[in-house]
Amino acid sequence: PLNDGNPIISSDTISLKKGVRDPHILRGPDGYFYMVVTDMRSWEGWSSNRGMVLMRSKDMVTWEHHTVHFPEKYAGTMFANVTRVWAPQTIYDKKAKKFMVYFSILTDDGKCPYDKVYWAYANEDFSDLEGEPKVLFDFHSAAIDTDIIEDEDGMYHVFFKTEGGRKKGYRQ
């Protein structure tokens, strides 16, 4: 077993909230492993997280980790008012030669009254996000747990879960 079955990462040492969930991992074209996680302790409530953790490893045992705390990083913008930054995931953008990080956001100021899916590129060393996040899509109802895959023909498919009313369910 990996690391002789011993824990590799302790969430209370890598996150501001001392807890993580929704891990997503992939291997990059450079051979490194990249992981993103929600920085959250569930017992504090569903609207209790304000960021994510970006991680990178050569061997899946030793990890570099960096928190992205939205109220601090995006002070003075709508992103400073997030009540949740949920289920971040990554995909490598071959054209840009960068990792795209995408996630759901909800704010408490009315500017994002339901979970919308946003995205931003990670910086070169996968320690932060570049620029302000942009809307990936707006389903006009809560959308969470997004996943993007590329098929063998180079076509991208987006899967997500909806949370609102009659539209509730998984979509492609």
Predicted feature residues:
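Beta-rich carbohydrate-recognition and catalytic domains
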Residues: 1-85, 91-172
